[in-house]
């Protein structure tokens, strides 16, 4: 069946793949719970603060009242199937947001009606911009003291440089909030104050709001008609513009990322969720309306392959998350981009060159599941029992191999040493750590080459705390966990070249390889890159090239200053010498590794440390204390702005090494009245004096 087939078009036209994203505590999970309740998936509304929210199904999530992993679920609304992913808002779990956005077609951005756009909202918004995800906005908590729709709307415009279009305005604010006015339909939606918000009445706009609503409505219509030339002409000619025409034009603007429709409500009080669901259908794209994904040929990376959203095309799917289920084993969440993935068939993973049999396919509802026989293009589900597939891998037909663009993962910035209490626990611990690393690519495992300790690295203190908690609980292990340490990195500042001849006799056989390579500094965000100017041939085979790259990358894991992983280096293989009788993969791996080490010695190595971006909100009386303290922590003050309603917002950057325990210190500096948020910004070169101190502490001087 092709995408022209009416059944396929109907199927996909009525599908939405969406995410719910926001700053921590803006009400994402509560909004999702309401959506599940109103779409009939959940017979009882789960509350985050009671620890029984459906989407928060890990023990750690229910205890902390925050979302850590992206739970995926399917719901139905007005003949449409909606696949929903609830993403975490805490900065330590940015990776979960990143990988969710990679496979979604649209998103609901939830904002706190009291605070408007907050730091993590900005981060998530930028991630959605990166993947060109159309969004609708939901200004939540309109019933809270201090709720201000106009202020929140303004922050979307100013802080996010977006073009928000209000499709609703609230009726009442704070404790008088009782409904919304739909500006396109010019009707009021009033919710019953009692009950679960199932029942609402659609009535005329309240008399005391008519004048204001008419003014707003005219402004909104004037903005919307600009998205369609014919409609603009019609409007300028003084003709009546209908509601369906306005919705069609606003949909066009939303899909082109020129507009972001704004809804409002109070999810906790069950108000405003049904019109938001209508907004998902009216303004967010179906899989047919997003550009076809482009992959490339694994054998020829410069050859592009377009994966069309068609059921009869060759199968291609992206694995975007791995989870371990205590009963089912490994669950691999996939988004199918073209063709159909069926139970019983074998698919190829081009990265590992291994074939995987699709034993079981399931549709997920948070942590319960329903077995299905196939997943078609445009759909999201999970495969049970894949052995060799990781996050960001492609699954495709071996006769039509394709590699889809993978997911980029941030560098971990903080680590702890983990040591099993007994030798019996040691094996269990290593198996448990390997599982965690497979599930969560933003956590890394490495053995310290000096001490032999196992180091678990992650994106922040909370992230590490939860990883360790899961390790101990899920795998029933007793372990000693060290204090969190900063994960330093190393880089080069000048280009260098080296060549190395490896010739050795092992077990009576000679192994020979000669490589010449050059290295140069690149952006730290680009990690370690390797390219070859030497073409694969009969003599210099593809496995030899792969072995040389492997040797290069492994050598970059241990820097010369402090044995830290290296970043920001591009390596180029310039030439090789092959002897047909004695050259081997092992020899090329060793030669490339040793050539890299020789080149690094001449490349002026520097130590890198993670820098964090901070935003501290505090009353005016304590600004001096906070700024003085940040300066003492090697911080850099970037801006100070007056906060609406009083107080100051201080924007700063500071090294992570100086921020351990900052939450406690900031409370005592402000008598408990300051709040702050921080997120990873970049790795930067450590100043010379500080570098000497760090290397002394590491025993490197």
From Swiss-Prot:
The keyword Cytoplasm applies. Residues 13-288 form the tr-type G domain. GTP binds at residues 22-29, 86-90, 140-143. Pfam families: EFG_C, EFG_III, EFG_IV, GTP_EFTU, GTP_EFTU_D2. GO terms for biological process: ribosome disassembly. It comes from the Bacteria. Keywords: Cytoplasm, Elongation factor, GTP-binding, Nucleotide-binding, Protein biosynthesis. It is found in: Cytoplasm. The keyword Protein biosynthesis applies. One of its GO terms (molecular function) is GTP binding. SMART domains: EFG_C, EFG_IV. One of its GO terms (cellular component) is cytoplasm. Coiled coil: none annotated. Catalyzes the GTP-dependent ribosomal translocation step during translation elongation. During this step, the ribosome changes from the pre-translocational (PRE) to the post-translocational (POST) state as the newly formed A-site-bound peptidyl-tRNA and P-site-bound deacylated tRNA move to the P and E sites, respectively. Catalyzes the coordinated movement of the two tRNA molecules, the mRNA and conformational changes in the ribosome. Belongs to the TRAFAC class translation factor GTPase superfamily. Classic translation factor GTPase family. EF-G/EF-2 subfamily. HAMAP family: EF_G_EF_2_B (MF_00054_B). This is Elongation factor G 1. It comes from Bdellovibrio bacteriovorus (strain ATCC 15356 / DSM 50701 / NCIMB 9529 / HD100). The lineage of its organism: Bacteria, Pseudomonadati, Bdellovibrionota, Bdellovibrionia, Bdellovibrionales. The gene is fusA1.
């Amino acid at each position: 069946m092709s995408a022209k087939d009416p059944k396929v078009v109907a199927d996909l036209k009525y599908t939405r793949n969406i995410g719910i994203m926001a700053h921590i505590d803006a009400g994402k999970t509560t909004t999702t719970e309401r959506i599940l309740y109103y779409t009939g998936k959940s017979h009882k509304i789960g509350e985050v603060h009671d620890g029984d929210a459906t989407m928060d199904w890990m023990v750690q999530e229910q205890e902390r009242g925050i979302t850590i992993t992206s739970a995926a679920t399917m719901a139905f609304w007005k003949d449409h199937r909606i696949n929903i992913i609830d993403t975490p808002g805490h900065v330590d779990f940015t990776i979960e947001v990143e990988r969710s956005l990679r496979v979604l077609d649209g998103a609901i951005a939830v904002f706190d009606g009291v605070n408007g756009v907050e730091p993590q909202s900005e981060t998530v918004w930028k991630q959605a911009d990166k993947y060109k995800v159309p969004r609708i906005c939901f200004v939540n908590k309109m019933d809270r003291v201090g709720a201000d729709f106009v202020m929140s709307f303004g922050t979307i415009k100013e802080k996010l440089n977006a073009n928000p279009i209000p499709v609703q305005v609230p009726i009442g604010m704070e404790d008088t909030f009782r409904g919304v006015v739909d500006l396109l339909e010019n009707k009021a939606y009033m919710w019953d104050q009692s009950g679960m918000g199932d029942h609402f009445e659609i009535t005329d706009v309240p008399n005391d709001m008519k004048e204001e609503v008419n003014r707003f409505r005219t402004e909104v219509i004037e903005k919307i008609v600009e998205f369609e030339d014919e409609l603009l002409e019609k409007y300028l000619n003084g003709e009546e513009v209908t509601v369906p025409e306005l919705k069609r034009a606003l949909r066009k603007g939303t899909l082109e990322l020129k507009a972001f429709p704004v809804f409002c409500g109070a999810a906790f009080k069950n108000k405003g969720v049904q019109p938001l669901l209508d907004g998902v259908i009216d303004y967010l794209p179906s899989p047919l309306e997003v550009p076809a994904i482009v992959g490339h040929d694994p054998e020829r990376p410069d050859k592009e392959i377009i994966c069309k959203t068609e059921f009869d095309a060759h199968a291609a799917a992206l694995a975007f998350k791995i989870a371990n289920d205590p009963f089912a084993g490994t669950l691999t969440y996939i988004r199918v981009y073209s063709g159909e993935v069926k139970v019983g068939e074998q698919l190829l993973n081009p990265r590992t060159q291994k074939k995987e049999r699709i034993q079981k396919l399931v549709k997920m509802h948070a942590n319960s599941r329903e077995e299905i026989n196939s997943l078609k293009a445009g759909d999201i589900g999970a495969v049970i029992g894949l052995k060799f597939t990781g996050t960001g891998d492609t699954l495709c037909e071996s006769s039509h191999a394709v590699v889809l663009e993978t997911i980029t993962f941030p560098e971990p910035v903080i680590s702890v040493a983990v040591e099993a209490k007994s030798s019996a626990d040691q094996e269990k611990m290593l198996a448990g750590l390997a599982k965690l690393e497979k599930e969560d690519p933003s956590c890394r495992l490495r053995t310290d080459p000096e001490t032999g300790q196992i180091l678990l690295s992650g994106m922040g203190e909370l992230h590490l705390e939860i990883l360790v908690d899961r390790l101990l609980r899920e795998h029933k292990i007793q372990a000693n966990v060290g204090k969190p340490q900063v994960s330093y990195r190393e880089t080069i500042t000048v280009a260098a070249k080296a060549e190395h001849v490896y010739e050795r006799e092992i077990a009576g056989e000679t192994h020979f390889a000669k490589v010449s390579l050059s290295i140069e500094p690149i952006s730290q965000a680009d990690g370690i890159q390797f390219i070859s100017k030497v073409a694969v041939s009969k003599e210099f085979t593809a496995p030899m090239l792969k072995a040389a790259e492997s040797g290069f990358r492994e050598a970059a894991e241990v820097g010369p200053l402090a044995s830290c992983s290296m970043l920001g280096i591009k390596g180029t293989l310039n030439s090789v010498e092959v002897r047909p009788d004695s050259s081997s993969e092992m020899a090329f791996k060793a030669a490339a590794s040793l050539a890299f080490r020789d080149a690094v010695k001449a490349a002026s190595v520097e130590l890198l440390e993670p820098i964090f971006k901070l935003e501290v909100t505090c009353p005016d009386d304590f600004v001096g204390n906070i700024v003085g303290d940040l300066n003492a922590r090697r911080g850099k003050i970037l801006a100070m702005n007056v906060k609406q309603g009083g107080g100051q917002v201080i924007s700063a950057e500071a090294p992570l090494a100086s921020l351990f325990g900052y939450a406690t210190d900031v409370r005592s500096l402000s008598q408990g009245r300051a709040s702050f948020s921080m997120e990873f910004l970049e790795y930067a070169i450590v100043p010379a004096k500080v570098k000497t101190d760090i290397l002394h502490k590491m025993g490197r001087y």
